[in-house]
Structure formats: structure tokens, C-alpha cells
């Protein structure tokens, strides 16, 4: 019996050590991006990269071993990034990775007609190529369906307790910025049901080299939405040395600025305008070495969403329908 007790005690000690001490291979690390496909309501498969949130990485003295801490899923900010015309989701690889390491969950789609989202499934089951060069304003408006499908994916993650959809941020570059503003206006125009909240989840926009219109697809009407005019946190970034791009971005900024009160503390600004001296635009501007634009975006999200998360608490959003 004494031998049995000694063996049991030894096993218990080993078990306690295995649970109490994390082995090197079990140490937390920021997950790799996942390849995800969502389907827009008109049958277009949208290929995406999803960067799971909830992991905050900070540098340590050991340069090759950063410290990673876990963040509660219900506090995770979800972010959708929309590339520009003739772009693709990998254009946002660096920004998405940067934001993921700050604890956020990031979803980056190839918008229809771009990257790997270049086919549509017809009612008869056949597939047809999407010819980007032949896309017109109505086709560009169809990108709203792409974003809605992406949001549905994030919505499911919300209900699984992996993120808080109430803290949604949408970013876009050039044409992607037009889509972002139009989709935000749509999200805030959803009809509300007595027992179920629909939409009204976008709380911040990041617009990189925003254009007023492209191929007849415009953000002018969406900018007139009262929530976008006065309530949403908006960051605008443009390379100032490109006069045409700077003029369009300044016009958009001015339309929003005149309807908002100036903050007493710049850190409390809900409208931020960044204009580095360069001709680069869109994702090329975000990715240029030497400009801390990714850090600026991260700080903006920290100030406008993370620090205000108590104002938008997580809720279970299961539809009664």
C-alpha cells in the first residue's frame, strides 16, 4: 500500500507541474492568418484572410521571443480592411498583422473582381468569370454585399464570444474607402426589430486616400448620413504631395469637420486628418518604410474604440427569426 501511495503522489506531482508550468511549445503566440471563404448574397464567393484576435504581442529583451498575452474575446475589436481598385487582400498584410498583434481581430477580403474573388456562381450552378475592366457603378455597389458577408462571419464570432461586433471598425483605401463609407451608412440605416438589434455596429472608419467617386460610384450621399457626419470616429490619411488626391481627401474632411465640435484635448479627437509629405497613396502609402502610419492607425483604434469599450458592451446577438 505504501508503494502505491508513493507512486500516486509522484504522479500527482508530475501532473501538477505539467498544469502549473507551461512548456515552451505551449507558450502563447499570435495565430497565423486563416484562409476563409464567405459567400455574398448574390452568389459571389469572397476569399478572405482572417487574423484571429485576442493576442497582444509586446517586445522583450529577447528580440526573437516577444511576450504574448491573452485578451478576453468579448473585448476584442473587429476590423474589416478593404483594398483599393486593382488591389488584393495581401496589400494589407503588414497593417493587418500589426493590428492583430495589438489584440484586434482583422478580416481582409478580396473584393469581387479582385484577387481570388474573381468568379460568380450562377443560378444553374455554373461559374462565370468577373471581368473587372467591365465593372460599372452598379457592380461596384455590389461590393457592399461582399462586406455584408464578411460582417456575417464576424457576427458569428461575436456570438461565440471571440470578439465584440459593437466595436466594429472598417478601413478602406481609395475605392475601398468609398465602399467603407457606403457600407457604414447602410449599417446605420438597418430597420430595427422590437427584440433584435440589426446593424449600427460600425463605430470607426479609417479612410486612406479616399476618392469622392469612381466610375460613377460615389460616397457623397453616404456622407450625408447624420451618424457619419457627426458621430462615427473617422481617420483620413492622404499623401499631400499628390494635389488631386489631397484635394479630394480635404473636401471629405472639411464636410465632416464643419459639423463637429473641436476637442479640448487632441487625444479626444473623433476626426483625425493625417497628411504626410509624399505622392504615395492607398496601401502603398500605408506600407511605405519610415512613416509610422500603421502605428497612427493603431493609436486611433486604441483611443476611439478600445478605451471606449465600456460604452459598447458585448451582447449575444442571436436573431429571433
How should each PLM-predicted stretch be described?
Residues 76-79, 83-87:
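Active-site glycine-rich loops that stabilize anionic/oxyanionic intermediates
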Residues 85-97:
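The serine-hydrolase catalytic nucleophile loop
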Residues 21-73:
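N-terminal cap/lid segment of alpha/beta-hydrolase-fold proteins
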Residues 262-321:
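C-terminal catalytic histidine-bearing segment of alpha/beta-hydrolase fold enzymes
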Residues 99-127:
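Conserved alpha/beta-hydrolase
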Residues 161-174:
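Alpha/beta-hydrolase fold nucleophile elbow
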Residues 125-161:
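Alpha/beta-hydrolase active-site loop
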Residues 194-268:
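The feature captures the conserved acid-bearing segment of alpha/beta-hydrolase catalytic domains
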Amino acid at each position: 500500500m505504501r508503494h502505491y501511495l508513493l507512486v500516486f503522489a509522484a504522479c500527482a506531482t508530475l501532473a501538477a507541474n505539467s498544469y502549473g508550468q507551461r512548456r515552451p511549445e505551449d507558450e502563447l503566440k499570435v495565430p497565423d492568418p486563416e484562409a476563409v471563404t464567405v459567400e455574398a448574397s448574390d452568389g459571389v464567393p469572397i476569399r478572405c484572410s482572417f487574423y484571429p484576435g485576442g493576442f497582444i504581442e509586446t517586445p522583450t529583451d529577447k528580440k526573437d521571443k516577444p511576450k504574448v498575452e491573452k485578451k478576453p474575446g468579448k473585448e476584442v475589436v473587429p476590423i474589416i480592411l478593404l483594398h483599393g481598385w486593382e488591389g488584393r487582400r495581401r496589400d494589407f498584410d503588414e497593417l493587418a498583422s500589426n493590428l492583430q498583434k495589438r489584440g484586434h481581430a482583422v478580416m481582409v477580403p478580396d473584393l469581387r473582381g479582385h484577387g481570388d474573388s474573381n468568379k460568380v456562381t450562377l443560378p444553374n450552378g455554373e461559374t462565370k468569370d468577373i471581368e473587372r475592366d467591365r465593372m460599372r457603378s452598379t457592380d461596384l455597389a455590389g461590393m457592399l454585399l461582399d462586406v455584408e458577408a464578411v460582417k456575417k462571419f464576424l457576427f458569428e464570432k461575436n456570438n461565440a464570444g471571440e470578439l465584440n461586433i459593437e466595436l466594429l471598425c472598417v478601413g478602406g483605401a481609395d475605392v475601398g474607402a468609398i465602399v467603407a463609407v457606403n457600407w457604414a451608412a447602410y449599417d446605420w440605416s438597418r430597420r430595427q426589430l422590437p427584440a433584435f438589434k440589426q446593424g449600427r455596429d460600425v463605430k470607426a472608419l479609417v479612410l486612406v486616400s479616399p476618392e469622392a467617386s469612381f466610375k460613377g460610384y460615389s460616397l457623397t450621399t453616404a456622407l450625408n448620413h447624420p451618424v457619419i457626419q457627426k458621430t462615427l470616429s473617422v481617420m483620413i490619411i492622404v499623401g499631400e504631395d499628390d494635389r488631386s488626391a489631397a484635394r479630394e481627401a480635404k473636401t471629405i474632411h472639411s464636410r465632416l469637420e464643419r459639423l463637429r465640435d473641436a476637442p479640448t484635448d487632441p487625444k479626444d479627437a473623433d476626426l483625425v486628418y493625417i497628411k504626410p509629405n509624399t505622392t504615395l497613396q492607398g496601401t502603398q502609402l500605408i506600407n511605405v518604410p519610415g512613416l509610422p502610419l500603421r502605428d497612427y492607425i493603431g493609436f486611433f483604434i486604441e483611443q476611439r474604440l478600445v478605451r471606449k469599450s465600456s460604452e459598447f458592451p458585448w451582447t449575444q446577438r442571436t436573431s429571433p427569426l
